[in-house]
Design a protein with these regions (language model features):
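Active-site-proximal or metal-binding-adjacent scaffold patches in catalytic folds
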Residues: 1-135, 145-163
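Walker B catalytic acidic pair
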Residues: 141
């Protein structure tokens, strides 16, 4: 009887943890919308102000700039190891808005597997960040993708200057 009760408690705990993980995930918090700028889908936070399309189009504009930069660097500096790494790992289809629960304003996950950006001036909403500021942040994240080391090392800062 005690082992059966323990089993029920354990099962309830596992289910609660799974529900918590789902509620904190991209799948629950983000809605994927097609951009009018480039026709690609971008996943953005569901906000009360209904500015989803503006957010998606902002991400599309910045992603297009990143694609041009990566293409230019690949064409003109393709023999450099850091540029090869950037060209190989940058995936414009993996750009999305950051979750409000994130402690970061932007990040690249696993050197390009996912790029996430905060698109608003305040963590839980506010007005959209301007395109030039978000482009600067995106260049910062591209520099992380092309850097072997993790963090803001000398290698990273040299790559950021290069970009």
């Amino acid at each position: 009887m005690k082992s059966q009760l323990f089993g029920y408690i354990l099962m309830a705990f596992v289910i609660a943890v799974c529900i918590k993980m789902f509620i904190d995930s991209d799948y629950y918090n983000l809605s994927c919308i097609v951009s009018t700028v480039d026709g690609n889908k971008y996943c953005v936070r569901v906000k009360d102000d209904l500015k989803h399309q503006e957010t998606v189009d902002l991400l599309a504009k910045v992603t297009n700039k990143c694609k041009k930069i990566v293409s230019y660097m690949g064409s003109n500096y393709g023999n450099r190891e850091n540029v090869k790494k950037l060209v190989k790992n940058f995936n414009p289809k993996k750009v999305k808005e950051i979750l409000p629960t994130s402690e970061f304003t932007a990040y690249s996950e696993n050197k390009g597997e996912k790029l996430a950006f905060c698109t608003t001036t305040q963590k839980n909403g506010g007005s959209l960040i301007d395109e030039n500021t978000l482009t600067f942040v995106a260049l910062h994240e591209l520099s992380h993708i092309m850097t072997k080391s993790i963090g803001h090392t000398d290698e990273f800062w040299n790559n950021f200057k290069f970009v």
